[in-house]
């Protein structure tokens, strides 16, 4: 039972997340052979100031 964690800056709608989750689920099922009912997609919305790369804060675009 695969668990896929997706971390994005805040601001995506429920509809956008549903599309992303569906496409991730279909891809994992196709390439890993897992049944879609066993695949879990978990979203973590990051507020600005919570993601740093190379010591520099990443900003929403």
Curated annotation (Swiss-Prot):
Keyword hit for Metal-binding: no
GO molecular function, one term: isomerase activity
Keywords: Isomerase
Record keyword Isomerase present: yes
Classification via Pfam families: Tautomerase
Protein EC: 5.3.2.-
Active-site residues, Swiss-Prot/TrEMBL: 2 (proton acceptor)
Gene3D superfamilies membership: Macrophage Migration Inhibitory Factor
Species name: Lactococcus lactis subsp. lactis (strain IL1403) (Streptococcus lactis)
Record-stated family: Belongs to the 4-oxalocrotonate tautomerase family.
Protein name, as recorded: Probable tautomerase LL0574
Entries under InterPro entries matching the protein: 4-OT-like_dom (IPR004370), Tautomerase/MIF_sf (IPR014347)
